[in-house]
């Protein structure tokens, strides 16, 4: 996916590449079935084996292309994803690598080189859209730069692929190692090429930022913020459905209840009130007018700090100002909390709003899974929408460019959310994810108890003791195994979480004992009989604790 958005490639496959295409289609189909299979968890060995087999085919494909075409340095470059030779094989291969990358994340191998492919693809799309929009700040770029540096370190590592040392006599492991050694150069070239492309895109964006005079940076930041606010306001609503649409959908609902029972007929989740739009729009318009008044007679912006005019960056700032005025005009004509665009653009707008809303809901939990939340499908949908553009614009018969910037913003926003979801992935295998979720919940509850002042007696902690004991009993000699007897990724994280929960629990118990002793001392000074009763009660409370510790 090295081509810029909207660029089309010939899909004619040379005869010598047809066998590889058929193999990749089979792999893509099997991976698609795998992510729909909810009966068993992914196995890291299976994922690693499939990945190495695909790399072997990639190596064969590279050799075929090098033998068929003149290359400056045949041994030092790869022709995979070459813009000139791009065909259907490359498109299917990209799908396979995307799926495999998500599989590596699913089995908890987040910090392995293959797992970075999906992240790099999303960063690549995000950077291309930021470049087209010309609306970004250092705050937008700094997280991307940090992530690219992290990926660089992973790719630079000699042993980028994880080693499995559970059983040195395992034939499958030896097979993986042999394949890895043969494919190491090809894997390295592919990832480095994709990483270099992202870095080049980033450097272009960083260079654009430096074109603006530092004294105008505050003005630029405010204009960016206003424009983002306007775009966000436009993208937060969906056109209200008419009564006839609702009646039609009611009939469809009866026929397809199983498929659509989770969706509202009126799509209320997308709607915002007209009052809200007007209120937010009024605030942003006032901020825009205030900034606009900070210009000289010739229309050049002054520095907010020194009140001096700097020449460098004036055209960029005035361009941002014009964009903001266009968006204000669009929002002023909104009806029923929604935006009506060109008939050719409206379906794209509706589709992007749906995708964005779904992805934003996922951000609440900061968790995705390969089967329950298929990020690959969302990436494919976004790519399909992106590829409809011609010369950066969505095709329409109208000469009015209204809506183009809004659609691009929605695309960019969706890519950004997918990027955040990928980065929020924990290096824990899906086989251990239920245990990880339970431990995280127990930890959160214990921390909340501690924050609210602890408990009055140890009995209140018994449910947490029992839960932690049951989770601790799932280990065998300190290791969590899956149902097939394998050792999934994420052992360190789970053991650290379990130990932290026990530590917090112990602190709460100590605090509860101190409270009980203080209460006993206070009662004893008033009434000796009550004091003896309190001591007896305290000693009774301690018995279950000793049983738990012995257990």
From Swiss-Prot:
Residues 542-551 have a biased composition (Acidic residues). The keyword Coiled coil applies. Induction: Expression is induced in response to DNA replication stress. The keyword Cytoplasm applies. Keywords: Coiled coil, Cytoplasm, Nucleus, Phosphoprotein. It is found in: Cytoplasm; Nucleus. Residues 532-541 have a biased composition (Low complexity). InterPro entries: UPF0662. Pfam families: DUF2408 (PF10303). Phosphorylated by PKA in vitro. Residues 174-213, 249-300 form a coiled coil. One of its GO terms (cellular component) is nucleus. Disruption phenotype: Leads to sensitivity to bleomycin. Bleomycin sensitivity is even increased when CUB1 deletion is combined with proteasome mutants including PRE9 or UMP1 disruptions. Suppresses the copper tolerance induced by the proteasome subunit PRE9 disruption. Leads to synthetic sickness with deletion of RAD6 on media containing bleomycin, but not hydroxyurea (HU). Residues 513-551 are annotated as: Disordered. It comes from the Eukaryota. Involved in bleomycin tolerance with links to DNA repair and/or proteasome function. Belongs to the CUB1 family. Monomer. This is Cu(2+) suppressing and bleomycin sensitive protein 1. It comes from Saccharomyces cerevisiae (strain ATCC 204508 / S288c). The lineage of its organism: Eukaryota, Fungi, Dikarya, Ascomycota, Saccharomycotina. The gene is CUB1.
């Amino acid at each position: 996916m090295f081509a810029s958005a909207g660029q089309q490639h010939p899909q004619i496959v040379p005869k010598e590449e047809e066998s590889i295409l058929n193999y990749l289609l089979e792999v893509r189909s099997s991976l698609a079935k795998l992510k729909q299979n909810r009966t068993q968890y992914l196995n890291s060995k299976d994922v690693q084996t499939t990945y190495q087999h695909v790399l072997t085919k990639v190596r064969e494909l590279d050799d075929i292309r090098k033998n068929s075409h003149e290359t400056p340095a045949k041994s030092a470059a790869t022709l995979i994803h070459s813009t000139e030779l791009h065909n259907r094989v490359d498109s299917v291969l990209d799908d396979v690598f995307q799926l495999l990358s998500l599989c590596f994340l699913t089995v908890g191998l987040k910090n392995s080189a293959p797992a970075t492919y999906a992240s790099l693809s999303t960063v690549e799309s995000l950077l291309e859209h930021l470049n087209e929009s010309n609306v970004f700040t250092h705050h937008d770029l700094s997280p991307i730069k940090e992530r690219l540096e992290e990926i660089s370190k992973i790719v630079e590592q000699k042993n980028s692929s994880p080693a499995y040392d559970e059983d040195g006599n395992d034939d499958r492991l030896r097979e993986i190692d042999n394949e890895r050694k043969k494919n190491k150069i090809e894997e390295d070239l592919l990832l480095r090429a994709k990483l270099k492309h992202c870095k080049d895109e980033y450097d272009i964006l960083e260079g654009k930022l430096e074109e603006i005079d530092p004294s105008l940076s505050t003005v630029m930041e405010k204009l960016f913020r206003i424009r983002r606010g306007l775009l966000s306001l436009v993208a937060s609503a969906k056109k209200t459905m008419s009564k006839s649409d609702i009646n039609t959908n009611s009939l469809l609902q009866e026929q397809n209840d199983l498929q659509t029972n989770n969706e509202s007929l009126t799509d209320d989740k997308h709607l915002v009130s007209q009052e809200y739009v007007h209120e937010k729009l009024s605030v942003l318009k006032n901020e825009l007018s205030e900034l606009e008044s900070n210009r000289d007679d010739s229309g050049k912006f002054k520095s907010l700090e020194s009140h001096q005019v700097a020449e460098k960056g004036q055209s960029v700032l005035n361009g941002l100002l014009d964009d903001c005025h266009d968006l204000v005009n669009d929002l002023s004509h909104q009806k029923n909390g929604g935006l009506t665009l060109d008939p050719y653009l409206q379906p794209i707008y509706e589709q992007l709003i749906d995708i964005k809303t779904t992805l934003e809901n996922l951000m609440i939990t900061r968790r995705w899974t390969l089967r329950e939340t298929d990020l690959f499908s969302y990436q494919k949908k976004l790519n399909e929408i992106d590829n409809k553009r011609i010369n950066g614009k969505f095709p329409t018969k109208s000469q009015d460019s209204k809506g183009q910037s809004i659609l691009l913003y929605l695309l960019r926003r969706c890519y950004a959310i997918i990027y955040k979801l990928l980065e929020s992935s924990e290096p824990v295998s899906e086989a251990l994810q239920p245990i990880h979720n339970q431990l995280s919940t127990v930890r959160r509850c214990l921390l909340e108890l501690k924050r609210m002042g602890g408990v009055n007696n140890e009995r209140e902690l018994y449910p947490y003791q029992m839960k932690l004991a049951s989770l601790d009993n799932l280990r065998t000699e300190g290791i969590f195994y899956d149902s097939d007897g394998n050792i999934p990724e994420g052992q360190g994280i789970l053991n650290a979480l379990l130990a932290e929960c026990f530590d917090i629990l112990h602190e709460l118990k100590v605090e509860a004992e101190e409270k009980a002793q203080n209460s006993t001392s206070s009662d004893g000074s008033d009434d000796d009989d009550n004091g003896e009763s309190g001591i007896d009660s305290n000693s009774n409370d301690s018995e279950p604790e000793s049983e738990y510790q012995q257990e």
